[in-house]
Amino acid sequence: MVAERQGLSIAAIRLPWMSNWRLDGREDLSFLDRPTETAYELGTYLHVRDGATAFAAALLSPRPGFEAYNVMAPNALTNRPLADVLREAHPTYPKLPASWPALRCPYVDTKFRTHFGWAPQVDIVALHQQNALHPTMR
């Protein structure tokens, strides 16, 4: 409320784990090839370039008042769909609609995408599946 009364534009951006996914083999992504066994192995991520473009989008398109936002890649770091992991953990829970956003990512960043017209560009899981990463990162 103070931000709005004072005519300020404040965007509090919550970022997940960020990495630059160096292509020199220093990052170990071998966990993407094995089954996910616990919820702790699921993780949201964001490539550092996408983080930079998110901040730029917020700076270039200010909105009045204060808003908090989640910003992340559209999927979780696992080689299995989050819906499968949730179904195994809670087999009696009713089936969720395929369009439910949380099936793709543990956090939802729809508000940031809508307000600023932003979308992440780097999908590390897709790059891994296409063997587009450095061999020591597979």
Predicted regions and their residues:
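Short, amphipathic alpha-helical "lid/cap" segments that border enzyme active or binding sites
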Residues: 48-56, 125-128
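Proline-glycine-enriched beta-turn/loop adjacent to the NAD(P) cofactor-binding site
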Residues: 16-21, 74
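Residue-level signal for the nucleotide or nucleotide-sugar donor/cofactor binding architecture
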Residues: 43-49, 107, 122
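Mid/C-terminal beta-alpha module of Rossmann-like enzyme folds, strongest
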Residues: 52-109, 137
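Amphipathic terminal alpha-helices
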Residues: 103, 109, 122-138
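Glycine/proline-rich active-site loop of Rossmann-fold NAD(P)-dependent oxidoreductases
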Residues: 5-9, 20-36, 41, 49, ...
